[in-house]
Amino acid sequence: MTLTLAMVTCDTPDPKGLASWWAAQVGGDVVDPFDGSYVMVVAGPVRLAFQVDEAPTPGKNRLHLDLTATDLDAEVDRLLAAGAGLVARRGDENFRWVTLTDPAGNEFCVASAAEAEADL
């Protein structure tokens, strides 16, 4: 295979603000090499990037992040306190996840790490 996933980019009217929020959530560093028009979060092998778009595409996300947490309930509480919005709590006793939105309205999901790894 010749492709390597390097970055996931999100359009937003506020790249710096959204990058700062995500960096605080995933423990990454904000890198701003283009004076605020394209801002990256470095927090592991795949970077998150945020680029200026004054009119993001309306409607449901066609792509979203799936994250895992060792303590799902505590992590969801922390994200909500940090400004995430709750969309839905989903799943059953075998696999639970929560769909949230970041401050710009982009959906993402958080699942229990142990349950997610058991399903792989």
Place the predicted regions along the sequence by residue.
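Vicinal oxygen chelate
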Residues: T2-T12, D32, M40-V42, V46-Q51, A55-L79, R96-T101, ...
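Amphipathic alpha-helical segments
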Residues: D14-D29, E75-A81
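Short, Lys/Arg-rich nucleic-acid/phosphate-binding segment
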Residues: G36
